[in-house]
């Protein structure tokens, strides 16, 4: 997306008012394939039901913000066992399977064929630590009078771990994302808090009694941790006049047939 500026110039003349309308063509990038492929294994389930989302990027001012991809071929292969899992086209941008077999520590390869071009990516299924406690308090946040949600987990010792924590409360348009590296918490119990600071300009309100918060906690690879860090940093700094111009983030999905045709999104 190219940045643009709207500049208003008022010229005052005695007895004269003149308005010039200038139309400027904003260059548009070609549509790119966007791959949202998160193979998540929720504790207490078999992990057999998985969904991969495919869409194409759209111009910033387009009326249709999401353009689902139909007719693609999607396959995931366990590179350790050779097992293949075909994801069926649901004709709405979703590709699903109900027979996926997750194996912690195994490496999986994604293959997407779209417009006669092949996109591939590989990722290892990473374990996640157990959540020890979830509680509310008013002690750990910035505002000592505001409610916050706390999540405590144990980090295994002498193992390099990376985590992804997602909070989404009632009425939130977007979730709050946290990426965590265990460099300074290795082998220890760690608590992270989620607090909503009231902001009238952004229509953000503090947590209210009875409000529900959805919490998801993932183990992730170092590569995905680094991708998330860039993604979150760009989002949080996008409103600052001193922040660098955002650039499209390219994940781990590579076009084998035409490397110059990049894909957005990530396979994990």
What are these model-derived regions, one by one?
Residues 1-5:
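Positively charged n-region of N-terminal signal peptides that target proteins for export
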Residues 6-10:
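Sec-dependent N-terminal signal peptides
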Residues 14-17:
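C-terminal motif of bacterial Sec signal peptides marking the signal peptidase cleavage site
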Residues 19-268:
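A sequence/structural signal for flexible, mid-protein segments enriched
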